[in-house]
Each structure stands twice: as C-alpha cells, then as structure tokens.
Regions:
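Small-residue-enriched, tightly packed secondary-structure blocks
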Residues: 9-133
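C-terminal segment of classical bacterial N-terminal signal peptides
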Residues: 1-7
Length: 133
C-alpha cells in the first residue's frame, strides 16, 4: 500500500467516509489484505481489500479513515485502485494515501502504521463491497 506524507483527509459534506484496517507484508513484491466500512449518508457498507505492490520490504499493520469522492453510484466503489508513493515505518507512524479507481472514485486516507516497513512503490488494490460480485 503506497503511503506518503502526512496529508489530512478533509471531507466535504457530499463525500462518503471510509474506515479500514489492513496488513502489508513484502520482500520486493508486497501483499495487502484487510477490511473496512464505507459510510454513505446513514448507511454503512462493509468491504474487503486485496492487492499488493512492487519495491517494498518488511511488514506493517495500518488503520485509518478518510474521504471517498466522486462516488456517484454505490457500485462505483468496487474496483481496482492505483497509487504511487512510498513510506518508511519503524514501530509507529502516520501517513497519507491518495488513490483512484477506473471509475474516477478517489480515496484520501490518513492512516496510523505499526511495524518495520520501507517502500517506494506502485500499488494496485482491489476494494470489494461484501455481497457484491
């Protein structure tokens, strides 16, 4: 998962919100798995995360929350999100993540990280609402 900087996720009133937790392990090529909840209005939708990236080493756990922009239809949330960036975590850290899928949905996330991890990578992550195909 490509994390960089310490950006703040400031949501507009029309944005959906997201909370997630995930794990990332890597030796050159990394694997990410996790779960979260998408909040749109008064509705909560659980989802899963799977994917990975290149050029990283170590392991970390992360938890975060942020904004989902340009979500015209709920099914537009499903898909592959891309991000480019890097992170370095030793013990604890805070980082920002910005990613976009092919339908123009953007996620801006602030995450707290734990572990020993170093990356400069391109990440490809699949977000899938539970119960959807």
């Amino acid at each position: 998962m490509a994390l960089h900087g310490t950006a703040q996720a400031t949501c507009a009133a029309t944005d959906a919100r997201i909370e997630l937790s995930a794990h990332h392990i890597a030796v050159g090529v990394g694997y990410v798995w996790g779960r979260g909840t998408l909040y749109d209005g008064t509705h909560a939708y659980p989802f899963t995360i799977r994917g990975g990236g290149m050029l990283s080493v170590g392991g970390m756990a992360l938890s975060g929350q942020g904004c989902v922009r340009n979500l015209a239809r709920l099914q537009d949330f499903n898909g592959t999100y891309w991000s480019v960036g890097g992170t370095a975590t030793i013990h604890h850290g805070t980082a920002g993540l910005v990613m976009e899928n092919g339908r123009g949905v953007d996620i801006n996330l602030v995450a707290h990280t734990r572990g020993a991890f170093l990356s400069g990578q391109i990440a490809r992550l699949s977000f899938r609402l539970k119960g959807s195909r």
